[in-house]
Structure formats: structure tokens, C-alpha cells
Design a protein with these regions (language model features):
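Predominantly soluble domains enriched in secretory-pathway, periplasmic, or organellar proteins
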Residues: 16-335
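Bacterial N-terminal signal peptides that target proteins for export
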Residues: 1-12
Length: 335
């Protein structure tokens, strides 16, 4: 065989192998998963974050509100106000068990930290902690405020911040990891109405909360435990607020289907991005830890919108199916 023909065959073979490898790589599923609560469908959707393809649905309690996940991505915990907390095996895509938090307790938010699952029980005006390894509720703590709803935990996992919608206050629980009787609670009144969405700044110095009842934002200094600033953004239904790693604040205004982007340092508005044609109902905002993207669950639009946080534009939209009602979103990286 002539050397030139041999060379051509080698080049063609290498090209074919490269094509096969490329196809194989494109067909290899990513270990990352989006966990999307489908409130209308009462299910947890497990989604390929690259394609938006729904890999499976796990039935959970009625009208699920929030979802937490373990660092290894293998277990998720879903709160249903009427049917307790579902414990989910993410790789197997099945519910392992359901935790009864008590009649009329109305669990709403869930947060995984230090091997435990913290949850709010809005009906009892309490927070609680569940040990998934022992499958038992370790304790419940009375907050003494109405509408105990969401929660956020400081990086040291010792201080928790909880908005109380009915009392127009934020509760601070110090020493929460130690359990009773080691912790203490303090209620901080906020000037706005119905605080709900909240988050801590990346440096932990400020807590921001969106006041859903009047379209504003209140900022608390985490050292002095005082409200330092409030301003009205004239929003119609600001129910979720999240920080990005670089210090932006994202607020989802479900009433107008708009994402508001603020610069936390200057307190200035950067952009208002239309993400749906109209009212999206209750929604969810999840920010990737690397700050590259944000995912918005738009309940009444039955979609998940992907935001490029560099360009602040819509990068993709994933349809979740008719009458699915996507809300809270979390991220599982299967290890």
C-alpha cells in the first residue's frame, strides 16, 4: 500500500473515532440534576440541566413548597404543608418514606445542614429538626411569631434567620445547631408588609428580605440586628429573593413575570427582565454556586427559565408539562 493511501486511511480513521467519541460524550448523561418541585402535579421532577429533559417524576405530598438536597446529591427532602416531608432517593428517583410533622403543622421550608434537616412548621409557629439517619424529629422550637415561613442559615451553621409573614418580623435563632436549650431567639420588626423571600449577602454582613405585601425590600445589619434601610421597588408580588456570589440581588416579581436585578453595594437597580408574559404565580429562584446561571421556576407559566448571569438575559426555557406548576428549584451533583 502506498504511504499516501495509508496516511489518508489513518486520518479518516482518526476522524471517525473523534466523531464517535463526540457522539458518545454528547449522549453521556451529566451527573448534575435540577430538582424542580411541580406544585400542581404534587411531584419532584428530576431534570437534565443541559437539555431540560425531565428524566423522571417522583410523587410527593400535595402541593409541595420547598426542596433541600444532601451535598452528595443522593437524597432530597420535600416539604408539603398538608402531608409532611418526603425523603427522596435521587438516583433511584423514588420516595423512601414520608415524615409526619404533626397535624396542622404545615411544614413549608426545608434546609439540609450538618447531616440534619431543618424545617419551618408554619401552623405551629415553630422550626424543627429532623435526623434522617435515625428517622426521627429531634426537636421543635416555638418562634412565637405568625407565619414562620422560609429560612436561611449562616455559613457557620450556628445562626438562622426566619421571616414571619403574619408578624412582619424576622426571627434570629442563635446557637441553632446546638439544639435546645442552647439557642435563643430574637424578633426583629421590619417596616414592610409580609416578609417572605430572604437571603444573606455573600459576606454574611447583611440580610435582605422582600416584603411581598408592599413590593419593597428591607435590609438588616447582621451584627447590630437592626433594619438599616428599606425601599419600595413597586413590585406586585415579590415572593423570592436570592444573592449571586458577586453581590447582585435577584428578586422574582411573580405578579408581572419580571426578574429584578439589583447591585447590593450601591442599592441601585441594574435591570428588569421580562421572563413571562404575565402573572407567574408563586415561583422559585435558584442561583448556581459558581454564579454562572440562575434558574427560575414559573408556576403559572409551567416552565423553568435559565438566566445567564453574565449577560442578564434568558439563555433557555424548559417546558415542564401542562398543569405542572414548577416552583422551588435545587441542584444535585451526584457523586
Amino acid at each position: 500500500m502506498r504511504p499516501s493511501r495509508l496516511l489518508i486511511r489513518c486520518v479518516l480513521s482518526l476522524a471517525a473515532l473523534a466523531t464517535i467519541a463526540s457522539v458518545a460524550a454528547s449522549q453521556t448523561p451529566s451527573p448534575a440534576r435540577l430538582l424542580v418541585l411541580l406544585r400542581n402535579a404534587s411531584a419532584l421532577a428530576i431534570v437534565d440541566p443541559a437539555s431540560g429533559h425531565v428524566l423522571g417524576r417522583v410523587p410527593v405530598g400535595k402541593d409541595p413548597h420547598e426542596v433541600a438536597v444532601t451535598p452528595d446529591g443522593k437524597m432530597a427532602f420535600v416539604a408539603s404543608p398538608s402531608e409532611g416531608i418526603s425523603v427522596i432517593d435521587v438516583p433511584a428517583m423514588k420516595e423512601l418514606r414520608r415524615v409526619d410533622t404533626g397535624a396542622l403543622s404545615a411544614p413549608h421550608d426545608v434546609l439540609y445542614a450538618g447531616g440534619k434537616v431543618y424545617f419551618t412548621a408554619e401552623g405551629f409557629k415553630t422550626i424543627g429538626r429532623y435526623d434522617p439517619a435515625a428517622n426521627k424529629i429531634e426537636w421543635m422550637l416555638g418562634i412565637g411569631q405568625d407565619g414562620t415561613h422560609m429560612m436561611v442559615l449562616a455559613k457557620d451553621q450556628q445562626t438562622m434567620w426566619v421571616p414571619n409573614r403574619g408578624s412582619n418580623s424576622i426571627s434570629v435563632i442563635d446557637g441553632v445547631a446546638g439544639g435546645p436549650p442552647k439557642f435563643r431567639t430574637t424578633a426583629i420588626p421590619v417596616p414592610g408588609k409580609t416578609p417572605e423571600g430572604l437571603d444573606l449577602s455573600p459576606d454574611g454582613r447583611e440580610l435582605w428580605t422582600a416584603t411581598r405585601g408592599d413590593g419593597g425590600v428591607s435590609i438588616i445589619d447582621t451584627t447590630s440586628r437592626k433594619v438599616t434601610q428599606s425601599f419600595n421597588l413597586k413590585l406586585t408580588d415579590a415572593n423570592r429573593l436570592k444573592f449571586t456570589p458577586d453581590g447582585k440581588v435577584l428578586i422574582l416579581d411573580g405578579g408581572t413575570g419580571t426578574l429584578i436585578v439589583l447591585d447590593a453595594a450601591s442599592r441601585k437597580e441594574i435591570k428588569r427582565l421580562k421572563v413571562a408574559p404575565g402573572d407567574t404565580g408563586d415561583g422559585g429562584v435558584f442561583v448556581m454556586p459558581d454564579g454562572s446561571r440562575a434558574y427560575l421556576g414559573l408556576r403559572d407559566d409551567h416552565s423553568v427559565v435559565v438566566i445567564d448571569l453574565k449577560t442578564l438575559e434568558i439563555a433557555n426555557r424548559f417546558a415542564m408539562g401542562p398543569n405542572s406548576g414548577p416552583g422551588c428549584i435545587n441542584w444535585a451533583f451526584l457523586r
